[in-house]
Amino acid sequence: MNLHEYQSKQIFAQYDLPVSKGYPCETVEQALKAIEKLGGDQWVAKCQVYAGGRGKAGGVKVVSSEAEVRSFFERFLGKRLVTLQTDAQGQPVNTIYLEACAAVKKELYVGMVIDRANRRIVFMASTEGGVNIEEVAEKTPHLLHKVAIDPFMGAQPFQGRELACKLGLTGKQIHQFAHIFCRLSKMFSEKDLSLVEINPLVILQNDDLHCLDAKIVVDGNALYRHADLKSLQDPSQEDPREAEAEALGLNYVALDGNIGCMVNGAGLAMGTMDIIKLQGGLPANFLDVGGSATKERVAGAFKIILSDTNVKAILVNIFGGIVRCDLIAEGIVAAVNEVGVTVPVVVRLEGNNAERGREILAQSGLNIIAAESLKDAAVQAVNAAK
């Protein structure tokens, strides 16, 4: 689960991490009061959306007057911001964060992720702040320094000091960086996070370190023990189809293709998407109905898939292990009748009660294309979508 920047900075402040004073604003009136409270003659206005790349899209700007604040709010508030990380529709800007402008001397990068291969939380830092860190990791990996956090001992100050020296920090900056290193690591573990980024962590003109940005992603599987974080979720930033799928117990991710996919099992779902691509098609979604699929969930899955107007065909690929193919077949028939599916539906059933499932589909009288194999199913779906 993503958090907005202003929410992330509020959590940063709880852990004694240096952040700028700021106010989230939902109206121009709130914004004018905010700059009055902040004082000074320059402020930074930041559109609050989950996606990155706001700056290049114009969603982050230094403003120097009430007129510029009004202009920025009129341009973005209530509109949708399109960045390199969003689709063509963008994400809605319901809140704009106003904070004091900082005098920056140098930009650094700091981040934390879970290294699943090594089963460790990894702290990363680089002198290349304020840029796409993926490019740094790919083109100049020697500039991205990493420290693995021991799960029993936790982050140690000496590790932070060593990392600070690698970044070329000196004097009080070494102590400040060690503090940020330890507090950030503590926050990561206590809040069950899966990602933290400060891009950039800056050196101010007075040589202090300061968190100019803040990004937090919470492990969704741990939200049951973090009601305070769960309450921060902003449904408007998420695809409504994905929210509906979550309510039905389905795993759904929208994509840009035109072949809808309904599969049981994440691995089989990814394999199905791969073979569609291999046959020259483009999957419109990832959808895993899970091992306890019911008629209602199958019908719900069809509705979600068909809510995407780009879908020209649907491929249903079910391997009956825990789930019975005959129940899936009944769900498909019920869904097609209920929803009124107008696009071709290709079905491949294998495993538990697969033969009975095929009989149900054949006797339904519906225009459902039966496939003999996964490759055959992909070929027929690609042809049907043309």
Curated annotation (Swiss-Prot):
Belongs to the succinate/malate CoA ligase beta subunit family. One of its GO terms (molecular function) is succinate-CoA ligase (GDP-forming) activity. The gene is sucC. GO terms for cellular component: cytosol; succinate-CoA ligase complex. The keyword Magnesium applies. This is Succinate--CoA ligase [ADP-forming] subunit beta. It comes from the Bacteria. Succinyl-CoA synthetase functions in the citric acid cycle (TCA), coupling the hydrolysis of succinyl-CoA to the synthesis of either ATP or GTP and thus represents the only step of substrate-level phosphorylation in the TCA. The beta subunit provides nucleotide specificity of the enzyme and binds the substrate succinate, while the binding sites for coenzyme A and phosphate are found in the alpha subunit. It comes from Actinobacillus succinogenes (strain ATCC 55618 / DSM 22257 / CCUG 43843 / 130Z). ATP binds at K46, G53, R54, G55, E99, A102, E107.
